[in-house]
Amino acid sequence: WQPPWYCKEPVRIGSCKKQFSSFYFKWTAKKCLPFLFSGCGGNANRFQTIGECRKKCLGK
């Protein structure tokens, strides 16, 4: 099993001023971590729940 390409992308908070609780996959640590997404911009390494992050990037 191979994780999707976006699991290897660095976290990007985006360029707006809002704060949404989100999770990203930290490739070097092989785990999902919380961060605050600004509401726009960013990248595909962003998940609404830790469960979604783990499912997509760890296959669990």
UniProtKB/Swiss-Prot annotation:
<feature type="disulfide bond">
    <location>
        <begin position="16"/>
        <end position="40"/>
    </location>
</feature>
<keyword id="KW-0872">Ion channel impairing toxin</keyword>
<keyword id="KW-1015">Disulfide bond</keyword>
<dbReference type="GO" id="GO:0090729">
    <property type="term" value="F:toxin activity"/>
</dbReference>
<dbReference type="InterPro" id="IPR036880">
    <property type="entry name" value="Kunitz_BPTI_sf"/>
</dbReference>
<dbReference type="InterPro" id="IPR002223">
    <property type="entry name" value="Kunitz_BPTI"/>
</dbReference>
<feature type="domain" description="BPTI/Kunitz inhibitor">
    <location>
        <begin position="7"/>
        <end position="57"/>
    </location>
</feature>
<dbReference type="GO" id="GO:0004867">
    <property type="term" value="F:serine-type endopeptidase inhibitor activity"/>
</dbReference>
<keyword id="KW-0528">Neurotoxin</keyword>
<comment type="function">
    <text>Potent blocker of high-voltage-activated calcium ion channels in the nanomolar range, particularly the L-type channels in cerebellar granule cells. The sensitivity of L-, N- and P-type channels to CAC is tissue and species-dependent. Blocks the L-type current of cardiac cells, depressing cardiac contractility.</text>
</comment>
<dbReference type="InterPro" id="IPR020901">
    <property type="entry name" value="Prtase_inh_Kunz-CS"/>
</dbReference>
<keyword id="KW-0108">Calcium channel impairing toxin</keyword>
<comment type="similarity">
    <text>Belongs to the venom Kunitz-type family.</text>
</comment>
<dbReference type="GO" id="GO:0005615">
    <property type="term" value="C:extracellular space"/>
</dbReference>
<keyword id="KW-0964">Secreted</keyword>
<feature type="disulfide bond">
    <location>
        <begin position="32"/>
        <end position="53"/>
    </location>
</feature>
<feature type="disulfide bond">
    <location>
        <begin position="7"/>
        <end position="57"/>
    </location>
</feature>
<dbReference type="Pfam" id="PF00014">
    <property type="entry name" value="Kunitz_BPTI"/>
</dbReference>
<protein>
    <recommendedName>
        <fullName>Kunitz-type serine protease inhibitor homolog calcicludine</fullName>
    </recommendedName>
</protein>
<keyword id="KW-0800">Toxin</keyword>
<keyword id="KW-0123">Cardiotoxin</keyword>
<dbReference type="InterPro" id="IPR050098">
    <property type="entry name" value="TFPI/VKTCI-like"/>
</dbReference>
<dbReference type="GO" id="GO:0005246">
    <property type="term" value="F:calcium channel regulator activity"/>
</dbReference>
